[in-house]
Amino acid sequence: MTVVTENTRIQSVLPVSTPAQVKAELPISARAAETTLQARKAIQDILSGQDDRLLVVVGPCSIHDTAAALDYAGRLAGLRERLSRDLLIVMRVYFEKPRTTVGWKGLINDPNLDGTFDMQTGLRRARAFLLEVGNLGLPAG
């Protein structure tokens, strides 16, 4: 009698898109690219002491409701503009729950919050969200 001990807890195996595939499906806009480039330069200048503004990274623990998070981003973008002389505001965007051992694992792993672990959808939803935030002129990190 042969006893199977390998892969006994695997229910199915599905392919996951490569980063290049997701980027091709959801390309970055000129506005989002410029937001990213300018923010990286400004952060570098702050950290090296060439810019005396305070770098402020704010945002939710982890995103599960992209519509609510986009509303938050819109409000934060307005604050970013008003306070730009003194602060560089970056939205904290986190999609996973790294310290969670039970329950929901995060937007990328389980975007539908139903235990289906549709990572294909999760990866695309996360990228689309980041692109929308970048299009608001708000850097994300």
Which ranges hold each PLM region?
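N-terminal catalytic cores of peptidoglycan-degrading enzymes
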Residues: 1-9
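N- or domain-start disorder-to-order transition segments that initiate the globular core
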Residues: 8-50
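Catalytic cores of large soluble enzymes that bind and process phosphate-bearing ligands
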Residues: 14, 28-35, 64, 68, ...
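A generic short-segment signal for beta-strand/edge and adjacent turn/coil regions
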Residues: 22-28, 57-60, 109-112
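Generic N-terminal targeting/processing segments that precede catalytic cores or assembly contacts
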Residues: 35-53, 64, 68-82
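Short glycine-rich or small-residue beta-strand-to-loop segments that form or flank ligand, phosphate
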Residues: 53-65, 90-94
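A generic, well-ordered mixed alpha/beta core segment in the N-terminal half of proteins
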Residues: 71-141
